[in-house]
Amino acid sequence: MQNSIIKNILNKISQKYPKIDTILLFGSALSSDWTEESDIDLYFIGKDLSDGRIDLIIDSIKVEIQTDNFNDLKTYIEDESGKLLNRNVSTMLATSEILKTESKEQIENLITLAKKTLKTPVDYTTEDVKMWKYSVNDYLEKSIKDVERGNIAAFYFDAHFVIQNATELILATNNHYFPQPKNLTHILEIISPEFLKNIEGYELATNLNDKLLSLQKIAKFCNLK
């Protein structure tokens, strides 16, 4: 349920942009833990709009508005079907709340399509699996050399690529697309708790040697896939 601050800002936006066909609310403003330090995210959709962005500050609250038209949004959502990464448009629409619309059937069809797209299985090949494993091992070797040389900055980036490629491998082979980070932990708890434990071990480690040990466990786990 929207609090009074959000409601007041949404009323001001409706008055400022009375001719917008459809307005969707998504993101943190739909959550009960929204605070005044959070943003308000909106989608303006209309036949004459194009892909764009409007940034506002209203009553000291940051408002971020995406703009687009129905036809292009439909294309974006269809293109996200089966993707491991970047199902962003589908996520925004599938989790949104309709604040206003003069095109009820069109927007409801788009939201339904977005929800279906989020459920599509991940498209990947055996070559993709080989490349993920290769990248994990390659960046692990680089990370080992970084530790030997005491190159902390290089280790940071190489370790990141180990974790990124490993996570993509685990998600794809368990038929999950890469969600927003805040939703990733819950998915990993279900599909691969041991992998999640190694990720958390890496983050909690206080020195490079312990972090490297966690990376090696991550790589070993991936090579078993």
Q: What does each model-found stretch correspond to?
A:
Residues 118-225:
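Conserved nucleotidyltransferase catalytic core and NTase-mimicking acidic/glycine-rich helix/loop elements
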Residues 50, 56-68, 95-101, 172-179, ...:
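Short, exposed beta-strand "edge-strand" segments with a Pro/Gly-rich flavor and a Y/T-containing core
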Residues 7-11, 15-16, 75, 105-112, ...:
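Polar/charged alpha-helical tracts
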Residues 1-38, 43-92:
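Metal-dependent nucleotidyltransferase catalytic core
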